[in-house]
Amino acid sequence: MESGGPTYRIENIVATVNLGVELDLEKLAERLAMAEYNPDQFPGLILRLTKPRISALIFRTGKMVCTGAKNEEDLKNAVRALVKLLRDHGAEVPFDPEVQVQNIVASGNLHAEVDLEQAVLMLENAMYEPEQFPGLIYRMSSPRVVMLIFGSGKIVCTGAKSERDVATAVQKLYNQLKDLGVLYIEEGGGEEEEELEEL
């Protein structure tokens, strides 16, 4: 990859976990000091882990939603920690429940300005209405993600199901925009900008 190519960072992974058993949330709430449970306001029990920093919404049906992971490894570790916590406090949940990533959100930078007016004319499944939203919305078919592209070169990727999908989508987008001639890469512009900030 040439210098000034795209970069990205995963902001959030949302996954569902099927524990396969019904849970007594009242009993768990009594036993787990860090649990938040107010069934009048929300039907699920909320647990927040600090390492990795993840929130889990646990429902009576045995379904669990995990949010906040920054990578798939953190997600796996969090699910293991949650399963251990639930088992240690009387819930007979399986050691290795079914985990399914529902959505990965990543932010990124193409390190080049984008001519959105031209890009929307050349990309299939793209929409750009600057009066309503400053970014171009591009529905990529493979991998199946939605990219928000801003004139500054900043991007947001949503809908990915794996970290590999994010990496593939970001690089593919960069290559497409470059091939279409709508990316404006300033050679050496970054160094000049840094020097100006220091003054």
UniProtKB/Swiss-Prot annotation:
Keyword annotations: DNA-binding, Repeat, Transcription, Transcription regulation
InterPro entries per UniProt: TBP, TBP_archaea, TBP_CS, TBP_dom_sf
Swiss-Prot/TrEMBL GO biological process terms: DNA-templated transcription initiation
Swiss-Prot/TrEMBL Sequence repeat ranges: 10-86, 101-177
A GO term for molecular function: DNA binding
Lineage: superkingdom: Archaea
Pfam families referenced in this protein's UniProt entry, alphabetically: TBP (PF00352)
NCBIfam families, per the entry: PRK00394.1-1, PRK00394.1-2
Family statement drawn from the similarity comment of this UniProt entry: Belongs to the TBP family.
Protein role: General factor that plays a role in the activation of archaeal genes transcribed by RNA polymerase. Binds specifically to the TATA box promoter element which lies close to the position of transcription initiation.
Protein name: TATA-box-binding protein
Record organism: Pyrobaculum islandicum (strain DSM 4184 / JCM 9189 / GEO3)
Taxonomic path: Archaea, Thermoproteota, Thermoprotei, Thermoproteales, Thermoproteaceae
